[in-house]
Amino acid sequence: MALWMRFLPLLALLVLWEPKPAQAFVKQHLCGPHLVEALYLVCGERGFFYTPKSRREVEDPQVPQLELGGGPEAGDLQTLALEVARQKRGIVDQCCTSICSLYQLENYCN
């Protein structure tokens, strides 16, 4: 009984120092092998999918061709280009260039 009373404060201290889920689950930059390791951790046996952009898509992104005459103004073209860029946003843009959480990584699991 005396031994139990000695370890009780230590046990209470360990319980109080346990990280809360919100603290342990921080958004962060994940690039290269760190991103792959995080995907393996999150997806497990389900696996994950990743289709990298080809070199051509990276160097020369396709912007919808507009007909001449009666086309949108320059401001509208910028808005359209931003929308196209948002649609092509992938895991590298989401987690390496920006920051992401493990919950966001789950979107890439099979």
From Swiss-Prot:
PANTHER family: INSULIN, INSULIN/INSULIN GROWTH FACTOR. Belongs to the insulin family. One of its GO terms (cellular component) is cytosol. One of its GO terms (biological process) is glucose homeostasis. Gene3D superfamilies: Insulin-like. The keyword Nucleotide-binding does not apply. InterPro entries: Insulin (IPR004825), Insulin-like (IPR016179), Insulin-like_sf (IPR036438), Insulin_CS (IPR022353), Insulin_family (IPR022352). CDD domains: IlGF_insulin_like. It is found in: Secreted. Insulin decreases blood glucose concentration. It increases cell permeability to monosaccharides, amino acids and fatty acids. It accelerates glycolysis, the pentose phosphate cycle, and glycogen synthesis in liver. It comes from Rattus norvegicus (Rat). SUPFAM superfamilies: Insulin-like. Heterodimer of a B chain and an A chain linked by two disulfide bonds. The keyword Plastid does not apply. Residues 1-24 form the signal peptide. One of its GO terms (molecular function) is insulin receptor binding. Disulfide bonds join C31-C96, C43-C109, C95-C100. Residues 57-87 form a propeptide. It holds the Pfam family Insulin. It comes from the Eukaryota. This is Insulin-1. Keywords: Carbohydrate metabolism, Cleavage on pair of basic residues, Disulfide bond, Glucose metabolism, Hormone, Secreted, Signal.
